[in-house]
Design a protein with these regions (language model features):
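Basic amphipathic alpha-helical segments that dock to polyanions
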Residues: 11, 30, 41-51, 194
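Helix-turn-helix DNA-binding elements, focusing on the entry/boundary residues of the two helices
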Residues: 27, 45, 83
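Extreme N-terminal segment that seeds HTH/winged-HTH DNA-binding domains in transcriptional regulators
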Residues: 1-35
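A short, conserved structural fragment
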Residues: 49-59
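Basic, amphipathic "hinge/linker" alpha-helix immediately C-terminal to the N-terminal HTH DNA-binding motif
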Residues: 60-79
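Mid-protein regulatory/catalytic core that forms ligand/cofactor-binding pockets
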Residues: 106-219
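Key DNA-contact positions within bacterial/archaeal DNA-binding proteins
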Residues: 39, 95
Length: 230
């Protein structure tokens, strides 16, 4: 039974991730992000629909029900709080944190969540700069900001006028956090939330970095690195 619960929670979190980045939640997008077959995704989504967690709209995009959104928010909150704990207290390497938090998100109790918040002085963002949702459910006064706002743009969408200029890294999207080698490369190049980095177009996409170190990112990777102008 726990395997089914873990799978359901993983799907719920993935749908919320897609919504955050402004991507329409479709079964095909879930299959891409979770590297699962179409039939497997369809079967799981059908079960979630029967359980009242999602609905499938006429154009086949997925919508979370009130209960589905409540559960998805809790899973995402646990995931990002776990990431904070793993970095700030345990000292796990940045590139290893996401995968470990994917395990913790299914077992962390609300009591532990509250203790983590106290221990870490009430964080509102993950180590990757992503807002921790649903904090008000734990009695927190400060609500997390939206994932995207008008001040942010992905590296892939940076206009030509910003070519060769410096920007501030704001968020590292969930999809690329699964690639430990890529995350290591980003860390080495100083591409972390709060860092000021230079951006230059390259044959393979964009070249981004600071302090003499740089990482070349393909467009599909750059699409998940969100920055703001200085």
């Amino acid at each position: 039974m726990s395997g089914l619960i873990d799978t359901t929670e993983m799907y719920l979190r993935t749908i919320l991730e897609l919504e955050e980045e402004g991507v329409v939640p479709m079964r095909a997008r879930i299959a891409e992000r979770l590297d699962q077959s179409g039939p497997t995704v369809s079967q799981t989504v059908a079960r979630m629909e029967r359980d009242g967690l999602v609905t499938v709209a006429g154009d086949r995009h997925l919508e979370l029900t009130d209960e589905g959104r409540r559960l998805a928010t809790r899973v995402m909150r646990k995931h990002r709080l776990a990431e904070c704990l793993l970095v700030d207290v345990i000292g796990l390497e940045w590139e290893q944190v996401h995968a470990e938090a994917c395990r913790w998100e299914h077992v962390m109790s609300e009591a532990v969540e509250r203790r983590v918040l106290e221990l870490l002085r009430h964080p509102t963002e993950s180590p990757y700069g992503n807002p921790i949702p649903g904090l008000e459910e734990l009695g927190e006064k400060a609500e997390a900001e939206s994932f995207l706002d008008d001040s942010m743009v992905s590296l892939a969408d940076l206009d030509a006028g910003n070519e060769g200029k410096t920007v501030i890294v704001r968020r590292i999207g969930e999809p690329i956090q699964t690639d430990a080698q890529l995350m290591y490369t980003l860390r080495r190049a100083g591409v972390q939330p709060g860092s000021v980095v230079s951006v230059t177009e390259s044959p393979g996409g964009v070249l981004v970095g600071s302090s003499g170190e740089a990482a070349e990112l393909e467009a599909e990777v750059a699409a998940h690195v969100f920055v703001a102008k200085q």
